Regions:
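Metal-dependent amide/peptide-bond hydrolase catalytic core
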Residues: 2-14, 35, 55, 174-367
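Pyridoxal 5′-phosphate
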Residues: 19-20, 224
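A non-catalytic alpha/beta surface segment that caps or lines the substrate-entry region
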Residues: 31-71
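Active-site metal-coordination/substrate-binding segment of hydrolases
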Residues: 46, 71-130, 333
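Acidic-glycine-rich active-site phosphate/pyrophosphate-binding loop
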Residues: 77-92, 169-177, 288, 320
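Acidic, glycine-rich active-site loops and adjacent beta-strand->loop/helix elements
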Residues: 80, 95, 129-137, 160-162, ...
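Short beta-strand/turn micro-motifs at beta-sheet edges
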Residues: 86-87, 164-168, 224-230
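Acidic/histidine-rich catalytic neighborhood of metal-dependent amide-processing enzymes
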Residues: 109-175
Length: 367
């Protein structure tokens, strides 16, 4: 792949690292959620240049397939949308800066190059997906993949775990909206006001979740007050509840409705938590690859939510999340990735794919 011409004032891209070239190209294309078209087109161009059969699907996802054998069917899925707010793209002191450098264009670019490293001779097939709208409540891209693709034999979801860390699971997510209206009245009237009831609904939710709730523990629910606005006559509040595996969302909604009789509580979205095990073939392959590259392996669960949740709702297949990058820089004003970190991520993914290619448990699961 040729190295793009350097614009005036733009740092040069190292010509000996095609994977860095690819990430640099991706970062130069803004792709906030809902506006991923140019980025998807660039991803297709890059994948075709690396030997993939590639195109965009009806949802706008960039999809590339390489290999055509009868062995394991692997899928690598990351997202190509970002939050809003651009960051000047630059390469400085071994770091590549730009919106999406961590979340999640680096994991996606790493997947593209890892699949290409195994090439058309891969004994099975590798499908790489750059999904749209992961940063939105509906996860449009992952939902479309879930509905239009056969479940793969193994799935790697691309998010910034750090090159030596494998993510085994994520909390689920419950988005709620509470709306209430009350007859207009004087502020001194002791009758409940709409704004007061909305605030009371929030405190009732916290009470129902219990004193140990919070975002610091994978095993406990945690809530965030996303919005609260109104006046004595009309008010609205929105809540984001992160839920652990096995959490009874129906029981929570019943109890909250029972204790907030004046308003209307609406479930906007519900995504269950997901957690795999250390014995999962994908976890084993990624973990072995980290160790083979001299990494101090870490296996974690996260209190956020990702496309792994969305896909696990319908696909009961081996899966884990992995990708280069420091997740503490997600959405940050100085979002960047260390080039060394990124290239290690490419190598780890490549090693893991080779291991999965010979994992007989994957093909046996289809027979």
């Amino acid at each position: 792949m040729s190295v793009p011409t350097r614009a005036p004032g733009r740092p040069p891209v190292p010509p000996d690292h095609p994977a860095v070239d690819t990430l640099h190209r991706f970062l130069r294309i803004p792709s906030p959620s809902g506006e991923e078209g140019p980025m998807a087109a660039e991803a297709v161009t890059v994948m075709r240049g690396l030997g993939y059969r590639a195109g965009t699907d009806a949802a706008g996802n960039a999809v590339g397939v390489i290999g055509s054998g009868d062995g394991p069917r692997l899928m690598l899925l990351s997202h190509i949308d970002t939050v809003s707010g651009q960051i000047p793209v630059r390469l400085s002191d071994g770091r590549l800066y730009g919106r999406g450098a961590v979340d999640a264009k680096a994991p996606f670019a790493a997947m593209v190059h890892a699949g290409a490293a195994l090439g058309p001779g891969f004994p099975g097939s590798i499908t790489v997906v750059g999904a749209v709208e992961e940063e939105t409540p509906g996860s449009k891209g992952a939902v479309a993949v879930r509905e239009t693709h056969r479940p793969p034999d193994a799935l790697v979801v691309g998010e910034p775990s750090g090159w030596s860390t494998v993510v085994l699971g994520y909390k689920g997510k419950l988005d709620l909206r509470y709306r209430v209206t009350r007859p207009p009245t004087h502020p001194s009237n002791p009758a409940p006001k709409a704004a007061e009831l909305a605030a009371e609904c929030w405190h009732t939710l916290l009470d129902l979740l219990g004193p140990d709730s919070g975002h610091g523990s994978f095993g406990r629910p945690g809530a965030t007050l996303v919005a609260l606005h109104g006046d004595p006559a009309a008010a609205e509040a929105e809540f984001d509840v992160r839920i652990p595996p096995g959490f009874d969302t129906d029981a929570l909604l019943r109890a909250l409705r029972d204790r907030t009789p004046y308003g209307e509580l609406t479930e906007l979205q519900a995504v269950a938590a997901v957690r795999t095990t250390r014995r999962d073939p994908v976890v084993r392959a990624l973990s072995a690859a980290v160790r083979a590259h001299g990494g101090e392996l870490s296996q974690k669960v996260k209190t956020a939510t990702s496309d792994m949740n969305t896909l696990a709702q319908a696909w009961d297949v081996p899966m884990a999340t992995y990708g280069p990058g420091d997740s503490r820089l997600d959405h940050a004003d100085d979002e960047h990735i260390e080039i060394d970190e990124y290239l290690k991520g490419v190598s780890v993914l490549t090693h893991a794919l080779r291991r999965l290619a010979t994992d007989e448990t994957l093909t046996r699961s289809r027979t």
